[in-house]
Amino acid sequence: MNALFLLKSKATVSVCYDDNTVRRGMESLRDSGFSAIPVITRSGDYAGSVSEGDFLWFLFDNPDAKPESVRLSTILRKGWNPAVTVNVTMDDLMQRAANQNFVPVVDDRNKFIGIITRKDILAFFYGQEESGRNGTEGP
């Protein structure tokens, strides 16, 4: 099974840019309705992901900081929610989904191409399990 089958393309995913301000990032996250959002560079590289908790801790740890003056790139946690390439296995996706709401996907040049959600990963595996029980072939 090719993981691209589950991909939500960049065009349909809410993202922030690493040069946005923290305030703009918070607004984008609120508007998205999600608890975390991918962050990319202006050239399309995946820079990381930012969560509600990242914003909360930034405000808590920096009470005098002005969110409209601080770049989003300064609050990104290194190594959190790392991206996978299109060659990722379904087993690797399942392992990532245990700890992440979505898995960012990049091409071989680290260009962000979209996400695969935990919901879609679980639905895929549930479908495989169901088809095995019914004696039919899965997706």
Where is each model-derived feature located?
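Short acidic DE-rich linear segments
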Residues: 132-139
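Short beta-to-alpha loop/turn elements within the nucleotide-binding domains of ABC transporters
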Residues: 20, 50, 70, 88, ...
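Helix-adjacent hinge/juxtasegments
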Residues: 40, 61-71
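Short beta->alpha transition motifs characteristic of CBS
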Residues: 34, 38, 46-62, 99, ...
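Bateman (tandem CBS) regulatory domains
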Residues: 1-13, 68-80
